[in-house]
Structures are given as structure tokens and as C-alpha cells.
Amino acid sequence: MTDPLASGFALFETPIGVCGIAWSPRGILGLQLPEATAGATRARLRRRWAGATESEPPAGVQRAIDRVLELLAGGAVDLGDIPLDLETAPEFHRKVYEVARTIPPGQTMTYGEIARKLGVPHESREVGQALGRNPVAIIVPCHRVLGADGKMGGFSANGGVATKRRILEIEGASAVGAGPLFERLK
């Protein structure tokens, strides 16, 4: 039997595809958004957390998975209290992630707004770089961060901006100053 406190990872089915989650005794190490196949998602997790073994998630990790699933099913779920293990992330990145975790589902913030909240108003590009390296997408909701004037900006997950747009649509987000983000042509 696998020790539930050992670093591990698991795959789980979501409305956007097969995601993966990796954990340590301190918290969630990473949340992998879907790759093209479940096998590719598994391979990405194995490369990124080589010491982790695929196993059944412990109770706390399963609760995190359940909450992510609820969010991706359209629930207004706050994931801000899920314990994370970001020990290896640079300090500036951790600060950016803390601010991003305060953005409620269905709302957005710009890279510049996060930079201003951190007291570094001219470092919106650095905020974007930190979010581009976010190992715990969804839990640290980098998809809720937009460029100036509500522009989508980039998204490093498989599917790029289309994936970001889909997650925001599930959450019911609106573009900053532009009305519904996903208004359909009639």
C-alpha cells in the first residue's frame, strides 16, 4: 500500500478533459490542465514531479479535486484555502499567486492591477511571467487575469487562450469594460 503522505499524483476527469494533480505532505504541488490525451497529461506530471508516484489521492487532496470539479461544473467555489506547496517557487511568484487567489470566480483582474496591489506598478510583465509559470492552475486562478483593456493575454496550458476562455465562460466571467466576454453572434 502507498503511504498517503508520500508525494504522489493522480488523474481525474473534468468537464474540460483529464486533469492531473500532484501533492506533497505540505499541500498541492501542481494541477495539470488537460493535455491532448490522458497519457500526455500523465507523462507531463511524471516529468514535472519525477519523484511522485501515481496513487489514490489522500482525503485532503480528494477534497481539493472535488472542489475543482465543482468549480469546473459552474459552481462559484472559492479555492483560496486549499493548502499549496509552493516552496520551490520564487518569492515574487508566490506573492503574485497570493493576490490571484483573491479573485472570485466569475471576476477578473488585469496584470497591471496585480502589480499595483503588490506595490510594483510597472511590473505587469513580470506578473504575467509569474502566472505563466503557475504550477497550480485553477487553484491559483491565472485564467482570471487579463491584459490591459480586458484582452485575454496568453495562457500556457494546452489549448492556450481557448482553454482560458472556456474556463472563464464556465465561471460566467465578463471582459473588463466590454460587456459579456462570450457574447454570441446572432
Task: Give the label of every model feature segment.
Residues 88, 131, 156-159:
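Structured beta->alpha junctions
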Residues 133, 139:
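Major-groove DNA-recognition helix of helix-turn-helix-type DNA-binding domains
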Residues 144-146:
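Short, basic, alpha-helical segments at the C-terminal edge of helix-turn-helix-like DNA-binding modules
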Residues 121-131:
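Short, positively charged loop/turn segments that connect secondary-structure elements
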Residues 1-122, 170-186:
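Basic nucleic-acid-binding alpha-helical/helix-turn surface characteristic of O6-alkylguanine DNA
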Residues 148-186:
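…primarily DNA-binding HTH/wHTH and HhH modules…
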